[in-house]
Amino acid sequence: MANIDLHFHSRTSDGALTPTEVIDRAAARAPALLALTDHDCTGGLAEAAAAAARRGIPFLNGVEVSVSWGRHTVHIVGLGIDPAEPALAAGLKSIREGRLERARQMGASLEAAGIAGCFDGAMRWCDNPEMISRTHFARHLVDSGAVKDMRTVFRKYLTPGKPGYVSHQWASLEDAVGWIVGAGGMAVIAHPGRYDMGRTLIERLILDFQAAGGQGIEVASGSHSLDDMHKFALHADRHGLYASSGSDFHAPGEGGRDVGHTEDLPPICRPIWRELEARILRPAD
């Protein structure tokens, strides 16, 4: 299977590269199809699509929606969306409006733990205050020398129970899937191997996702081991879900796979991009 990367990020959300830069970086691997999926926003899609067209690379409009499901935060990728669809645009805006207040609370929590200046420091890494995230705090903490690398900063400060973690109510699973499908796209559970869930809880998530109208699961992910990939291929097959593939690239040197670099899906999988042919933006001949 040719490289197909349907999950990566730009500076429009919490990536380190502009939409053009991240497409140019992916182009070095001669991908067959790309989709930019910034968190809770679609502002980088036009630039990314234009960059892909210049490079002769087929492109899908995408987004990654933050969801609260029970006590868990999960992410739902939307592929082949119309970013101008009013319900999707309004829903994403409602999510973004809560990010800045959460960031202020994170900064105050870190200051109470003895690390001052984190909110202002994180803002310097963020082009759009509406999109400030844990990743921007993490980059500040690494850059300031407080922590040696991104993996350590999340483990030490930015996960549940740690000083810089602030819980937040994101979109419901039903709303997120509804916005995506209503905008002409297909909804995909992103990087399921990252969630702190056992088999029973993952099964429940999949069933709730399908009941909401979800259609796919990210089998090949920069967050997944080969064992994870084969496990979620079996989940996809058992539940009749399409399989997707994405690097979840954010920045050079921050771990995981580089943009445009994905594993082949196991043979039992039904690739989701075959169902999205009509939504693919293809370079002019």
Curated annotation (Swiss-Prot):
Q: What is its EC number?
A: 3.1.3.97
Q: GO biological process annotations for this chain's record?
A: dephosphorylation
Give the binding site residues for Mn(2+) 2: 14, 39, 250
A GO term for molecular function? nucleotide binding
Q: Quote the record's binding site residues for Mn(2+) 3.
A: 64, 75, 191
**Binding residue positions for Mn(2+) 1:** 7, 9, 64, 248
How the cofactor binds, per note?
Binds 3 Mn(2+) ions per subunit.
Q: Which reaction does it catalyse?
A: a ribonucleoside 3',5'-bisphosphate + H2O = a ribonucleoside 5'-phosphate + phosphate
Q: What class of enzyme is it?
A: hydrolase
Sections of the chain in a coiled coil: none
Q: Which UniProt keywords apply?
A: Hydrolase, Manganese, Metal-binding, Nucleotide-binding
Q: Which cofactor does it need?
A: Mn(2+)
Q: Which InterPro entries match?
A: 35NBP, PHP_dom, PHP_domain, Pol/His_phosphatase_N, Pol/histidinol_Pase-like
Q: Where are the transmembrane segments?
A: none
- For binding substrate, which residues are annotated in this chain's numbering? 14, 39, 99-102, 134-135, 250
Source species, domain of life = Bacteria
Q: Which family does it belong to?
A: Belongs to the PHP family.
NCBIfam families noted in UniProt: nside_bi_sphtase
Q: How does it assemble?
A: Monomer.
Q: What job does the chain carry out?
A: Hydrolyzes 3',5'-bisphosphonucleosides (pGp, pCp, pUp, and pIp) to nucleoside 5'-phosphate and orthophosphate. Has similar catalytic efficiencies with all the bases. Also shows activity with ribonucleoside 2'-deoxyribonucleoside 3',5'-bisphosphates. Does not show activity with nucleoside 2',5'-bisphosphates.
Please give the name of this protein: 3',5'-nucleoside bisphosphate phosphatase
